[in-house]
Design a protein with these regions (language model features):
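Active-site donor-binding loop signature of nucleotide-sugar glycosyltransferases
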Residues: 25, 38, 130
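The catalytic Nudix box helix
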Residues: 36-81
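Nudix hydrolase/Nudix homology domain
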Residues: 29-34, 77, 88-91, 99-160
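Short, flexible active-site-adjacent loop segments at beta-strand->alpha-helix junctions, enriched
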Residues: 14, 26-27, 72-75, 113
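A short catalytic or substrate-binding loop motif that flags glycine-/basic-rich loops and adjacent residues
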Residues: 1-3, 98-101
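Short, flexible, mixed-charge acidic loops at enzyme active sites
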Residues: 26-27, 79-84
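N-terminal strand-loop-strand
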Residues: 1-35, 63-64
Length: 160
């Protein structure tokens, strides 16, 4: 099986401290690891629509800004039988080894609303300081979900 994912790095600044949302994966039979909101896109669902849906299901938040959305081009109206969307995400990933074959994109976002206590197969969506994520990653990178470990390392290197 091959999957395509759309994932969110939801940011805010409190004072001079940058924070992002992480949550704990709570999928039956799977390990409980720290992850970013997001998930699989449905057939013919756009990356942005999947991102908005997954963030709402998992965190309860509404996305109010998606970095790169201004680059979005779609071909709707040109050929009624075939539509394509192109957009510039923050980062893209591809698994190159492991039990799940997937590709996906990360978008930097801003959100509004109240966090859920638990969402769709997730627990404790919460704001964490970026510097704390950096410390946690250095201390024990395996506490993060396999895919998001790479996404977070990329973010920590290129967040500027």
């Amino acid at each position: 099986m091959f999957y395509v994912n759309s994932r969110a790095i939801i940011e805010r600044t409190v004072g001079d401290r940058a924070e992002i949302i992480v949550q704990t994966r709570n999928k039956p039979g799977g390990p409980r690891r720290i992850e970013l909101p997001g998930g699989r896109i449905e057939p013919f669902e756009s990356l942005v629509a999947a991102l908005v849906r997954e963030v709402k299901e998992e965190t309860g938040l509404d996305l109010v800004e998606i970095e790169g959305e201004e680059t979005r081009i779609e071909t709707a109206g040109i050929n009624p039988d075939f539509e394509v969307e192109c957009i510039r995400p923050f980062a893209a990933y591809q698994t190159t080894k492991g039990p799940i074959d997937s590709v996906g994109v990360y978008f930097r976002c801003k959100a509004a609303g109240e966090l859920l206590e638990s969402g769709d197969e997730t627990l404790r969506p919460r704001w964490v300081a970026v510097e704390e994520i950096r410390r946690m990653m250095a201390q024990d990178p395996l506490q993060f979900a396999d895919v998001d470990r790479a996404g977070l390392l990329f973010y920590l290197k290129h967040q500027g």
